[in-house]
Amino acid sequence: EHGKLYMLQTRNGKRTAAAALKIAVDLVDEGKITEKDAVLRVEPKQLDSLLHPQFDAKALKAATPIGKGLAASPGAACGRIVFTAEDAKEWANKGEKVILVRLETSPEDIEGMSAAQGILTVRGGMTSHAAVVARGMGTCCVSGCGEITVDYEAKQFTLGGKAYHEG
């Protein structure tokens, strides 16, 4: 008004990690900010999300969660359910993507954990064996999903009254 600019309202701009990184790189390329400033503009947690697989945002909105656990290691995974490290290795060697489902993991499960796209445990927290090993390997892990009942003999787990079988 009359040559003056008035700010009526401001809001924080929300953007994805990829967008934040692109903006920072573009600003450096244009000479508007230094590389040091660009690094400071991208949150470390945002970078972490760029290093791991993610589900498509639209697919995620349309999905119905079946249970809850701790996001012990970031990422997204899909595959066939397996219940032993040996089965995880065997199926992975055949070219199948697998999710290793265990009550909890132990050092004996390491080869199966390595073969799996993701790990799901009934017990455990952020410092559990599954969580620590999965983070170290860059594998997605949900731990502490206590609503699950695992039946190794039947090769299935039950959650919310529904059974999920191996494969």
Labelled PLM ranges:
Residues Y6, T10, F83-D87, G95-K97, ...:
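Acidic, glycine-rich flexible loop/linker segments
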Residues K14, L21, P65, G69, ...:
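Generic hydrophobic-segment detector
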Residues I23, D37, H129-V133:
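Residues within well-formed alpha-helices
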Residues K32-A115:
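Protease-associated
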